[in-house]
């Protein structure tokens, strides 16, 4: 297309050739979110588990085969020589989520009911079971009886909300509202016992991948190559293989050759590599070297192998090599044949299982093993850098699917073991086998429930369990919920001060949000996904393998090792499948097929030209992201495609999947990204075409859809994050999760333990484009406040702010706070159960000192009751048996078990829910609401990590005002700006001013061409000072302020930390039982700790009496009687006024001393360990003298 064509009018014939603009890219992004939503990675992963993985696990399990233990019965001659029972599991079925009431009725379960009634949102799982009884006669004929049990119930599987088996799947907004659900709720979590649980993605190193690391010297080894090998089908724990090259100098100081040794699974010592080759059946040195070096002219590499060849010179055939390995196995003292068989088994089944575990895999294994050594040698020769542990291409994420898959596999195996045991018992005792009894559905039901409820992944109290995999979904704000659903965790110990894994790595660009990570010990280990990342669910490798076969891949049987250096090695999911002579054509074809969706779109194709490798990935857990495809410096997507996208009637036709299918967009994973050339903006692409001389690259292959999509959920809410110092964006990402807003639209129908709702939330005047996809406009969390930056009176020093009291009275940042209390009537035995009701002081023991007046006769406070600290809101009693109280019938017949309000809170009873739980027992939730009005000490923040507390509130008359009569709502100290460099806040302020004036929203999306100058000019046009300064007048005196004040609307957030929840003091109060020191914490009405540092200051001051008062009198003073002779604690009976020390038979020389109770406890604990701490109350010498006199 020529230059002049560019500027021709729209109705040209070449209309379809018109290029799109960066603005049009947002239409594409909208299409993505419309189709995918924000938690697609969770849903797809779970669906994969339900639809494929579960069936695979059941199919994988071998038949249960049982032979009766024959009881020797001499007189009785049986009809059959032997009987074999076989049980196997077939097709599985999952129904919609159901619940069984206590009376046995079943009904469809909806999430709302599960939340309110503390049920688990799970669906029953059924399986077809076939039982075969094979009877062998004495004459060798067989009789088989087959019995089919269809749809046997084997357990309940928790269902992820909005996944394809959920009752809410593909419901319209209207239906969702009628079901009491929030239409904006994204799903992606589970409901376990009424609480919402998220599975956090777990990061791990990718399996079947050769890594070579250089060891820090001095070390026994110079280089280590490792492969975590895991077969696709069997999900056994991966077997790791290490190949290590020893350092030149051994630990003793003598120079040993650089031997190379390998670790094999279940073998105690390291085995020289040459012996492994010989055990695989490659005996001649030439054959072995061919599998490692490929090229005999490479003398350097051959030389490195010399020591290893010499080391293994003594072993020259396969049997001896196998015996060498077998000798070092687990079992000791078996025959040679057994050892050889054992070694063969290990080489076949346990070594590199992903290459193959069948009979004739030796060639493939030898080649792969040779490849590992080849890589190790390349690294040792310095021809190739060591691998990077933190590269994101080497990482995989375990989402809900794989996590639940591993758990289900374990539980299903346990179930089959139990079935086997039960059937064996039945058969041995000659009973009939009833499969309904044999299959304990509780195994799977409670196993899955336990792991999801506690977050301990794996069996209860077993080793190798991971903690914190499932977490309670954060429902503070809508953004915090979304962010929690897109979080991922690296299971590295939090204590390790390792910097490397925590740093932002180049390969994380576009995959992980650079700003959103917690501060403190988990920094950089807990990450969040960027907006458009998709995590692959994995697809089968066989279509790829078939394709490679057709397109001229040569496998190991057909090739001679000499050709390997010239050809390109081909790997599929880390397994070396063969070589190819024309990789360029192969890659082009693969990509073409992928763009036509003939090959799954999530397949990754990585061509490493320098290494002559082509790596193809189809596995699960790779991060990938969509990019525009560029060919000949032009985007494949054109203006007309954008128009069809915008004009479509229904969301089903066209849309995102259509763009992918047409080959305009493709998903690129982290590793493939390094083989592409990506243009940052559409504009860069146009520039590269117009003047190729200045272009960064003349072969762009892809183009970013929009650079701002590298940010995650919380960082996408920040306006102009590209104008802030980077840690500020991190702080805001953390605070945005604590801002009050409307966390979900159906909060009236929910009984959350804690909930905060802002009275009058506003959408921000200054927005980012990504916000509309995060539904921040529908569910905002803040208010556009008029903010002045000024020192006014000095009550805004050190990050505090001055707030306008009149604005507060009008409802500025007023919020609701809900807290729910729950209780249930538990069964105490078979007959006795607890009862809700108003306790009667006459007959109930252990009643609280709070007020019981607010309760109705049913034991519940009715809605609309005003309650304050310690008032009882749920009355509950338990009957007590009459015979205690030492025989005499006590006047009490019941014991009090009521729930009272937290003592520091007041409010109104908002809603009471009385229902039954899964066991049919009555159970109640009471929600109390209170209004929180901003006051001194409450915490607020802007969207730029500028947090502050209210230092003072002034009424409107006392606030400064502008000529137009505007008074600010908030005054921030100017010292908050320079050192923190949050220029974004200043730009937001003047843009907000323009936006308010023109009645539009300001666009503050990062990496766009908005400049401060443009905004300033627009502000000037509106008739203001162009940099946002205003003349103001002092509210106290009415005089004009000498400085110009920077003023304008800025979006502020109210954070959940409020002074009413924190204020705490104590005069007297409860003490701990063990140490008799004051309790700890506000909730227990505890004391304030006078710690070691405070103690040191008092010592430095020399304030001895004060020190004694704090650490002794006010803490745990205690009086104890001590024997003067031996210095141990004596017995004192103060009633009878008698004292004695039995050890010394001393009844007179006894004194009383004052020591801390904790000290007395320590002394007694020492005595229990047979160490006698003696308290000598007078001089030792004197005591001896007296003893002499006494004698």
UniProtKB/Swiss-Prot annotation:
A zinc finger (C4-type) spans 1123-1144. Zn(2+) binds at residues 1123, 1126, 1141, 1144. Residues 842-903 are annotated as: Disordered. GO terms for molecular function: DNA binding; DNA-directed RNA polymerase activity; ribonucleoside binding; zinc ion binding. It catalyses: RNA(n) + a ribonucleoside 5'-triphosphate = RNA(n+1) + diphosphate. SUPFAM superfamilies: beta and beta-prime subunits of DNA dependent RNA-polymerase. Signal peptide: none annotated. Pfam families: RNA_pol_Rpb2_1 (PF04563), RNA_pol_Rpb2_2 (PF04561), RNA_pol_Rpb2_3 (PF04565), RNA_pol_Rpb2_4 (PF04566), RNA_pol_Rpb2_5 (PF04567), RNA_pol_Rpb2_6 (PF00562), RNA_pol_Rpb2_7 (PF04560). InterPro entries: DNA-dir_RNA_pol_su2, DNA-dir_RNAP_su2_dom, DNA-dir_RNAP_su2_hyb_sf, RNA_pol_bsu_CS, RNA_pol_bsu_protrusion, RNA_pol_Rpb2_2, RNA_pol_Rpb2_2_sf, RNA_pol_Rpb2_3. It comes from the Eukaryota. Its EC number is 2.7.7.6. Keywords: DNA-directed RNA polymerase, Magnesium, Metal-binding, Nucleotidyltransferase, Nucleus, Transcription, Transferase, Zinc, Zinc-finger. GO terms for cellular component: mitochondrion; plastid; RNA polymerase II, core complex. One of its GO terms (biological process) is DNA-templated transcription. Residues 893-903 have a biased composition (Basic and acidic residues). Residues 878-891 have a biased composition (Polar residues). Gene3D superfamilies: 2.40.50.150, 3.90.1100.10, DNA-directed RNA polymerase, subunit 2, domain 6, RNA polymerase alpha subunit dimerisation domain, RNA polymerase Rpb2, domain 2. Coiled coil: none annotated. PANTHER family: DNA-DIRECTED RNA POLYMERASE I SUBUNIT 2. Belongs to the RNA polymerase beta chain family. DNA-dependent RNA polymerase catalyzes the transcription of DNA into RNA using the four ribonucleoside triphosphates as substrates. Second largest component of RNA polymerase II which synthesizes mRNA precursors and many functional non-coding RNAs. Proposed to contribute to the polymerase catalytic activity and forms the polymerase active center together with the largest subunit. Pol II is the central component of the basal RNA polymerase II transcription machinery. It is composed of mobile elements that move relative to each other. This is DNA-directed RNA polymerase II subunit RPB2. It comes from Solanum lycopersicum. The lineage of its organism: Eukaryota, Viridiplantae, Streptophyta, Embryophyta, Tracheophyta. The gene is RPB2.
């Amino acid at each position: 297309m020529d230059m002049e064509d560019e500027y021709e009018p729209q109705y040209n014939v070449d209309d379809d050739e018109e290029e799109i603009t960066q603005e049009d890219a947002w239409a594409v992004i909208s299409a993505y979110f419309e189709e995918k939503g924000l938690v697609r990675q969770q849903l797809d992963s779970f669906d994969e588990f339900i639809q494929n993985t579960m069936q695979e696990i059941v199919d994988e399990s071998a038949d249960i085969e049982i032979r009766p233990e024959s009881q020797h019965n001499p007189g009785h001659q049986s009809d059959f020589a032997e009987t074999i029972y076989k049980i196997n599991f077939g097709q599985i079925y999952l129904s919609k989520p159901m619940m069984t009431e206590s009376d046995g009725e079943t009904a469809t379960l909806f999430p709302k009911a599960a939340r309110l009634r503390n049920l688990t949102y799970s669906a029953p799982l059924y399986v077809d079971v076939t039982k075969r009884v094979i009877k062998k006669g004495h004459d060798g004929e067989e009789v088989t009886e087959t019995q089919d049990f269809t749809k046997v119930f084997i357990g309940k599987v928790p269902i992820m909300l909005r996944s394809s088996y959920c009752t809410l799947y593909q419901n319209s907004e209207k239906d969702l509202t009628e079901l009491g659900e929030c239409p904006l709720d994204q799903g992606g979590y589970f409901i376990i016992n009424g609480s919402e649980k998220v599975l956090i993605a777990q990061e791990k190193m990718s399996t079947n991948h050769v890594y070579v690391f250089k060891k820090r010297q001095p070390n026994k080894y110079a280089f280590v190559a490792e492969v975590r090998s895991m077969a696709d089908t069997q999900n056994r724990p991966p077997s790791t293989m290490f190949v290590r090259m020893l350092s030149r100098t051994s630990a003793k100081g003598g120079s040993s050759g650089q031997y190379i040794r390998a670790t094999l699974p279940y073998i105690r010592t390291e085995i020289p590599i040459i012996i492994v080759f010989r055990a695989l059946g490659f005996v001649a040195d030439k054959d072995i070297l061919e599998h490692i070096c490929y090229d005999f002219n490479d003398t350097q590499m051959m030389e490195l192998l010399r020591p290893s060849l010499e080391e293994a010179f003594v072993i020259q055939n396969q049997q001896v090599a196998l015996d060498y390995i077998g000798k070092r196995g687990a079992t000791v003292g078996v025959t040679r044949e057994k050892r050889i068989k054992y070694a063969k088994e290990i080489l076949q089944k346990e070594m590199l299982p992903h290459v193959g575990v069948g009979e004739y895999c030796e060639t493939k294994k030898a080649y792969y093993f040779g490849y590992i050594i080849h890589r190790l040698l390349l690294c040792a020769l310095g021809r190739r850098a060591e691998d990077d542990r933190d590269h994101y291409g080497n990482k995989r994420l375990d989402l809900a699917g794989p996590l639940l898959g591993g758990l289900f596999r374990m539980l299903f195996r346990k179930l089959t073991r139990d079935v086997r045991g039960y059937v064996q018992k039945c058969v041995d005792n000659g009973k009939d086998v009833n499969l309904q009894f044999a299959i304990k559905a509780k195994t799977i039901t409670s196993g899955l429930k336990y792991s999801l409820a506690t977050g301990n992944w794996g069996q209860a109290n077993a080793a190798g369990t991971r903690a914190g995999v499932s977490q309670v979904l954060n429902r503070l704000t809508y953004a915090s919920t979304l962010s929690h659903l897109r979080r991922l965790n690296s299971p590295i110990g939090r204590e390790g001060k390792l910097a490397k894994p925590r740093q932002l790595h180049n390969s994380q660009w576009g995959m992980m949000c650079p700003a959103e990570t917690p501060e403190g010990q988990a920094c950089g280990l807990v990450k969040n996904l960027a907006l458009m990342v998709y995590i692959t669910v994995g697809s089968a490798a066989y279509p790829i393998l078939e394709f490679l076969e057709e397109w001229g891949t040569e496998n190991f049987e057909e090739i001679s090792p000499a050709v390997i250096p010239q050809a390109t090695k081909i790997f599929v999911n880390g397994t070396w499948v063969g070589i190819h002579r024309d990789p360029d054509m192969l890659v082009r074809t693969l990509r073409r097929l992928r763009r036509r969706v003939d090959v799954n779109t999530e397949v990754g194709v990585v061509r490493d030209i320098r290494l002559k490798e082509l790596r193809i990935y189809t596995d699960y857990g790779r991060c990938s992201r969509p990019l525009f495809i560029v060919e000949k410096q032009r985007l494949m997507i054109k203006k007309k495609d954008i128009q069809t996208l915008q004009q479509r009637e229904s969301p089903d036709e066209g849309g995102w999947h259509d763009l992918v299918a047409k080959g305009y967009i493709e998903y690129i994973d982290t590793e493939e990204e390094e083989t592409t050339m990506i243009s940052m903006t559409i504009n860069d692409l146009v520039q590269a075409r117009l003047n190729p001389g200045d272009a960064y690259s003349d072969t762009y292959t892809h183009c970013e859809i929009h650079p701002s999509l590298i940010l995650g959920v919380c960082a996408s809410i920040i306006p102009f994050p590209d104008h802030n110092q980077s840690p500020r964006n991190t702080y805001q990402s953390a605070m945005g999760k604590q801002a009050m807003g409307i966390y979900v639209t159906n909060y009236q129908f929910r009984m959350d333990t804690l909930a905060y709702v802002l009275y009058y939330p506003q959408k921000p005047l200054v927005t980012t484009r990504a916000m509309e996809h995060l539904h921040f406009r529908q569910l905002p969390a803040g208010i556009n406040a008029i903010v002045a930056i000024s020192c006014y009176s000095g009550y805004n020093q050190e990050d505090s702010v001055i707030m306008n009291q009149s604005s507060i009275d009008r409802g500025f940042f007023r919020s609701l706070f809900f807290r729910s209390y729950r209780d249930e009537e538990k069964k105490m035995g078979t007959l006795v159960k607890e009862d809700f009701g108003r306790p009667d002081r006459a007959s109930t023991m252990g009643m609280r000192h709070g007020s019981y007046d607010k309760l109705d006769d049913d034991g519940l406070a009715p809605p609309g009751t005003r309650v304050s600290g310690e008032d009882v809101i749920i009355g509950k009693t338990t009957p007590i048996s009459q015979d205690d109280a030492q025989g005499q019938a006590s006047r009490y017949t019941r014991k009090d078990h009521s729930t009272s309000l937290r003592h520091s809170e007041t409010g109104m009873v908002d809603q009471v829910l009385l229902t039954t739980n899964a066991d049919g027992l009555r159970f109640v939730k009471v929600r109390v609401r209170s209004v929180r009005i901003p006051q001194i000490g409450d915490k607020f923040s802007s969207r730029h990590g500028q947090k502050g507390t209210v230092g003072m509130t002034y009424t409107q008359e006392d606030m400064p005002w502008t000529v137009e009569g505007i008074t600010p709502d908030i005054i921030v100290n100017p010292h908050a700006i320079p050192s923190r460099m949050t220029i974004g806040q200043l730009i937001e302020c003047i843009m907000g001013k323009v936006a308010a004036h023109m009645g539009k929203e300001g666009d503050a999306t990062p990496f766009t061409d908005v400049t401060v100058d443009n905004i300033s000019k627009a502000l000037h046009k509106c008739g203001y000072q162009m940099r946002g300064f205003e003349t103001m007048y002092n509210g106290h005196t009415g005089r004009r302020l000498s400085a110009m004040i920077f003023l304008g609307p800025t979006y502020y957030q109210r954070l959940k930390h409020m002074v009413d929840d924190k204020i705490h003091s104590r005069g007297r109060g409860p003490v701990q039982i063990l140490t008799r020191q004051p309790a700890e914490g506000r909730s227990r009405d505890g004391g304030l700790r006078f710690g070691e540092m405070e103690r040191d200051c008092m010592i430095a001051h020399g304030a001895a009496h004060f020190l004694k008062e704090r650490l002794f009198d006010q803490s745990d003073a205690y009086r104890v009687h001590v024997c003067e002779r031996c210095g141990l604690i004596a017995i004192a009976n103060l009633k009878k006024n008698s004292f004695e020390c039995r050890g010394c038979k001393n009844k007179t020389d006894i004194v009383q001393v004052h020591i801390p109770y904790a000290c007395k406890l320590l002394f007694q604990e020492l005595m229990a360990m047979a160490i006698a701490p003696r308290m000598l109350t007078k001089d030792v010498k004197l005591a001896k003298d007296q003893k002499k006199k006494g004698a």
